[in-house]
């Protein structure tokens, strides 16, 4: 069995710095919105603070991923500590679902018994929240040519949260102009649905990763077909297992090949193929000269299992 590795590049310091600044801005204004929501009586502000919590958590996980990716693996933790960010994402997703349910429940109560809402204060805080989101987005997007995945994902989170702040501003304007307070719980429910969408996606992705599911973006049947088609010596690919450790995909696979003139060169070619086409830096490849026999040979097999090249 042959083990192939390539050294992964550590995240740049300015990625971590940008994440840290954006985290500070977002977390700070989230607290302002929570306090403002209670003082003004606005549920829409509290819902937007819940939405900001999704951003704060996304930024925190991105920061943790940067930190943990720098910590070397140990004898006990051979993959390092990257899975901790997945566990944190799972806990965060559940917390967000609970927060959303509580806000929707409170919104329904407010339809039955409306409460006064301080429109002016609500407006001021919602505008400040919008500016904070714009600042966070600029911090993350500015100089993103390094294309760090964590930073790009966090920027998308913040962009989504702009909608929450806009919603709170609309509710505040309606209350200031018309005094119609039901605008507040209506907008808070709409913002809660945005939070629930983010939370559901986070929950689904983190559960898939914790259960060692293959990355959603990777089509294993297509990978097997392409390897058989594009590497002439490869006749069959089977026993493919792919899972994620943090952001890094890890793969093991068996490859039936025509006996090569240079075993190591072919191994190197397969390794580089996986890295160039699928960004898989860590693959354990078992090369075989005989067809696979046994009940597990057709595991995760599409049509690819029967692709052969005749030479």
From Swiss-Prot:
It is found in: Cell inner membrane. Belongs to the cation diffusion facilitator (CDF) transporter (TC 2.A.4) family. SLC30A subfamily. One of its GO terms (cellular component) is plasma membrane. It is a multi-pass membrane protein. Residues 1-18, 67-87, 141-157, 201-311 are cytoplasmic. GO terms for molecular function: zinc ion transmembrane transporter activity. Its main location: membrane. The chain crosses the membrane at residues 19-39, 46-66, 88-108, 120-140, 158-178, 180-200. Residues 40-45, 109-119, 179 are periplasmic. Involved in zinc efflux across the cytoplasmic membrane, thus reducing zinc accumulation in the cytoplasm and rendering bacteria more resistant to zinc. It may contribute to zinc homeostasis at low concentrations of zinc. This is Zinc transporter ZitB. SUPFAM superfamilies: Cation efflux protein cytoplasmic domain-like, Cation efflux protein transmembrane domain-like. It holds the Pfam family Cation_efflux. Coiled coil: none annotated. Keywords: Cell inner membrane, Cell membrane, Ion transport, Membrane, Transmembrane, Transmembrane helix, Transport, Zinc, Zinc transport.
